[in-house]
Each structure stands twice: as C-alpha cells, then as structure tokens.
Amino acid sequence: AGGRGAGAGLGYFALNPSQAPAVVRSTLSSVGLIEEGPPPTPTCPLTGLPAPHGQVPDRPVLAIKVENYPDARPQAGLSSADIVYEELVEGGITRFVVLYQCHDAPRVGPVRSARTADPDILAAFGRPILAYSGGAPNVVRVVNEADLIPIDETRGGDAFTRDPSRPAPHNLYAS
C-alpha cells in the first residue's frame, strides 16, 4: 500500500528509539541496536525540574489559597511554589492558588478563603490538600464535597498562625 513495509517502520524506531513502543525498544535493545544509559533523573511532576535530593516526595500536592489584595503584600512563600495560579475572585481582585509538591516554604500567606473554582483548578492533581481560611457556606460545601483534602484554620492546628504585626484579615499564614 504506501510503499513502506515493516522494515521501514522498525528502521525508524532504530534511529529514533525514544519514539518506539516499549516492546519494540526491548527487542531492539536485546539485539544491540539501542545503548542503555543510566536511569533517568527523577523529576518533579509539576515543574519537570530535577527532584530535590534525587527523589520526588511521596505526598499529595499541597495547595494554599493566598491573598493578592494590595494590603496583603508582600506575600510569603510564592517564590518556593512549584506552580502559582492567579484567579479572578471579584471586583478585579485576584487570589493565588499556590501549589507545592517537591518544594516547601517555611511560611505561606496571607491565607484567605476558598472559592468554588478551586476544586476544578485542583482536579488535575489527584487528591490534593487544600489549605484555606473559610469561605461562604456554599463554597465550603463545594470544597468539602470535592475530591480533595480540605484543611482550614479551624482544622489545621499549628499549621496556621496569625502574625500580630499585620492587620486582620491579612495576617493568617500556613507553615
């Protein structure tokens, strides 16, 4: 039919082994056509960067809601995040959903309320932990019914602290 037989296809994989299906790679390797190298370096799933200490932490993604209102600045912990989402909440104000998988921050915040969009934003990350500070009753219901682990300041114990040098509500931090 198109002039390319099975040999032409296998020749392509011999020249481009990374494109070969696993079974073909194994067969090509066993006849010496592919040189096996060292195992790949573990990479952080959210960034594609090398994992710290050569190992991806075995834990769920941690998402923290962080305020972006001018009175809340400067925020803490954003530069250590693997991913930072900015979402419009109301009246031109935005909030961040800050994600950590391979990295940590000693302090993140100011932590603010959850929004109904948060479960949809986080759906791609398995069953993440969402750290937040309250929300409207319908929002809290949506968050509690979502496939995530919700933790607010009433359930988070020592993970949440208030900074007395900052005015409320811009003074709640997660660690």
Residue ranges: model-predicted function:
Residues 3-25:
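Hydrophobic single-pass membrane-insertion segments
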